[in-house]
Amino acid sequence: MNIVVEFFVVTFKVLWAFVLAAARWLVRPKEKSVAGQVCLITGAGSGLGRLFALEFARRRALLVLWDINTQSNEETAGMVRHIYRDLEAADAAALQAGNGEEEILPHCNLQVFTYTCDVGKRENVYLTAERVRKEVGEVSVLVNNAGVVSGHHLLECPDELIERTMMVNCHAHFWTTKAFLPTMLEINHGHIVTVASSLGLFSTAGVEDYCASKFGVVGFHESLSHELKAAEKDGIKTTLVCPYLVDTGMFRGCRIRKEIEPFLPPLKPDYCVKQAMKAILTDQPMICTPRLMYIVTFMKSILPFEAVVCMYRFLGADKCMYPFIAQRKQATNNNEAKNGI
């Protein structure tokens, strides 16, 4: 194609992409079904991972739950089984009422499988993934959610904690994706969800390791998405989830300026996950919660650095992590004193 003609074609496609994006904001697309599909969630034992598991269970997905904590993972599985029992009871009642067997059969055999896995260890990921393939089947939806935070200033953070943060928050996404993507490519079907953070789009002081890991995983996700497009594997969808501070206890004590906080409070975990689920089930490539984060990211990209610093100071975002770090340090000192260290 002549380069001039191609230029106009590309220009039209870019403008059309804006039109489609605007349409998505005004009229939300119909949500796809994940009923009967194998959905694997890392970090499913608590926080957002547990809530993702419950949401996928309500949509009748077959769940595979990974967590390093066996007990909390089993607790999540118990909640999922309770949802499954309610769904099966509703199906049985509908069948008895004569609403049509064809609506019931596709949703039978709802199951949840639990695996204790440290996603920060490559071999553990690959071995557990092989067990999943043998015992459950191939994964259709992969939700990379597991995450950790050290809670130390850079010069006070032990090297092993920095490495741990990078392994769990970033490297694990490489390993889980390498484990399950090949089959998705073969059948041109699947969905990879990356739960990152707004701190993967812009940073703040005191959490260098966490920000680096989240920036890294955002880059991984974007490159993977481009690779799938280049390979014309349009049946494999990707969704990047970048929430603002979520009130899960992970960053307990983190505070912005008190006058601003009523307008930008920590997100409720339920709200965060429900918004993410809407994005996943409509194949939305990326979601920032709240939407203000889109504006913050855009302004950070165009403003001079000193202007960004001024904004951070006004919002109290420049040192928002310091109370959280102080609490972590105090808790560590208390544990050491309690254990006689």
Swiss-Prot record:
Record-annotated active site: Y210 (proton acceptor)
Enzyme class: oxidoreductase
Gene3D superfamilies: NAD(P)-binding Rossmann-like Domain (3.40.50.720)
Any one of the GO BP annotations: retinoid metabolic process
Superkingdom assignment: Eukaryota
Tissue and organ expression note: Detected in retina, kidney, liver, small intestine, placenta, lung, heart and skeletal muscle.
A single MF term (Gene Ontology): all-trans-retinol dehydrogenase (NADP+) activity
GO-annotated cellular components: cytoplasm; endoplasmic reticulum membrane; lipid droplet; membrane
Positions contributing to substrate binding: S197
Record keywords: Endoplasmic reticulum, Lipid metabolism, Membrane, Microsome, NADP, Oxidoreductase, Signal-anchor, Transmembrane, Transmembrane helix
InterPro entries: NAD(P)-bd_dom_sf (IPR036291), Sc_DH/Rdtase_CS (IPR020904), SDR_fam (IPR002347)
Its membrane topology: Single-pass membrane protein
Pathway: Cofactor metabolism; retinol metabolism
E.C. no: 1.1.1.300
Transmembrane portions of the chain: 3-23
Binding-site list for NADP(+): 40-64
Location within or outside the cell: Microsome membrane; Endoplasmic reticulum membrane
Keyword Zinc: no
Pfam families for this protein: adh_short (PF00106)
Catalytic activity, as annotated: all-trans-retinol + NADP(+) = all-trans-retinal + NADPH + H(+)
Family assignment from sequence similarity: Belongs to the short-chain dehydrogenases/reductases (SDR) family.
PANTHER family linked: PKSB (PTHR24322), RETINOL DEHYDROGENASE 10 (PTHR24322:SF736)
Role played: Retinol dehydrogenase with a clear preference for NADP. Converts all-trans-retinol to all-trans-retinal. Has no detectable activity towards 11-cis-retinol, 9-cis-retinol and 13-cis-retinol.
Protein name in the entry: Retinol dehydrogenase 10
Gene: RDH10
